[in-house]
């Protein structure tokens, strides 16, 4: 899952959306889901269409409050079979190298079919 908020910085989460889009194209749309806290759906649709991003999107009417300090940051995470959040990662444009490493681990450990 990838959580974004309209109150977050678009330049902060757009690089990650593009990377997630590539993973979705490579492994299937059912493997990558975006949870978006946007009150104006038109802005969200424009963001995705303008950047050729084709991901499953679920619009949230509230923030996730997973990590209240980071409600407006993009957050990547897995949902376990028991519906627990696992391997959460708070993304920021200051940690591009870390996001690349995180997505590489995601791809190798969770997405590749053996």
Model-predicted segments: where are they?
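A generic local structural motif
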Residues: 18-22, 62-65
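Short, charged/polar "capping" segments at the starts of alpha-helices
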Residues: 39-46
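Thiol-/selenol-based redox modules, centered on thioredoxin-like
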Residues: 80-114
């Amino acid at each position: 899952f990838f959580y974004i908020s309209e109150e977050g910085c678009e330049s902060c989460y757009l690089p990650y959306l593009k990377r997630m889009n590539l993973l979705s194209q490579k492994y299937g749309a059912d493997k990558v889901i975006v949870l978006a806290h946007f009150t104006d759906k038109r802005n969200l649709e424009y963001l995705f269409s303008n950047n050729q991003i084709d991901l499953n999107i679920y619009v949230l009417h509230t923030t996730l409050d997973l990590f209240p300090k980071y409600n407006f940051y993009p957050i990547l995470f897995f949902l376990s079979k028991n519906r627990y959040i696992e391997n959460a990662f708070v993304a920021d444009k200051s940690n591009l190298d870390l996001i690349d490493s995180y997505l590489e681990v995601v791809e190798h450990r969770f997405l590749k079919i053996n």
